[in-house]
Design a protein with these regions (language model features):
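Basic, glycine/lysine-rich polyanion-binding surfaces/domains
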Residues: 1-171
C-alpha cells in the first residue's frame, strides 16, 4: 500500500493494485432549493451554465460545477470554484424569489474510492445496487455505507466513486 499527500488541493491517497482511497479537501458545496419551473431556476441555470437535473440520481456538469439532484426542488452544487463567489452568484440569481442558497462546504467532506475492485468494496457496506446497469457514471444518490449516510456519486467507468459524508462521520 502506498500513501501520498500532494498538497492542500490534491487528494490524500492510499493505493493498492485493486483500489485506491483518497480525501479531497476544499470542495465548494452549495445547497440550492428553488421551484424548478420558476424564472429563478432559469436564472440559476444561466449562472451555472448547466441545467438543473430533473430526475432522481441525475447530475449535470459544466466547467468547475457538478449539480446533483437531491429532490424535486433541491440540488447540491459541487464546485472547484471559490465558495464565496459561487454562493454569492447563486444568491444573486435567486434574487427575491422564494428559495434557498446555503454554503454547506463545511457540512460534508469528500472521500474517493477508485479502481477495479472499488465497486466490490462499496458493495460490502452499501445497500444500493451498484451494478453498471443500475448505477453508472454521472449518477448521484443519497444512501448509506455502513451506518453512515452519504451522497454517493459515480464519476467514471474505472470505477471512481466520490462519497460525501457529513463532517461528523469523516475520517
Amino acid at each position: 500500500m502506498t500513501a501520498t499527500s500532494t498538497g492542500p488541493s490534491r487528494p490524500i491517497a492510499f493505493a493498492t493494485r485493486y483500489a485506491s482511497t483518497g480525501r479531497w479537501p476544499f470542495i465548494t458545496m452549495v445547497n440550492l432549493r428553488v421551484d424548478p419551473a420558476s424564472e429563478a431556476a432559469d436564472r440559476i441555470e444561466k449562472t451555472l451554465r448547466a441545467p438543473l437535473p430533473r430526475q432522481f440520481g441525475h447530475t449535470t456538469v459544466s466547467g468547475p460545477h457538478t449539480i446533483a439532484w437531491l429532490g424535486p426542488d433541491e440540488w447540491l452544487v459541487l464546485s472547484q470554484a471559490d465558495e464565496t463567489a459561487v454562493a454569492a452568484e447563486l444568491r444573486e440569481a435567486l434574487g427575491g424569489d422564494p428559495g434557498l442558497v446555503a454554503d454547506v462546504s463545511a457540512n460534508r467532506t469528500t472521500l474517493e474510492l477508485s479502481g477495479p475492485a472499488a465497486r466490490q468494496v462499496l458493495e460490502k457496506g452499501c445497500p444500493l445496487d451498484l451494478h453498471p446497469r443500475s448505477f453508472g457514471p454521472g449518477q448521484a444518490v443519497s444512501t448509506t455505507v455502513g451506518p453512515v449516510a452519504v451522497l454517493l456519486r459515480q464519476v467514471d467507468d474505472v470505477p471512481t466513486y466520490r462519497l460525501f459524508p457529513r463532517s461528523s462521520f469523516a475520517v
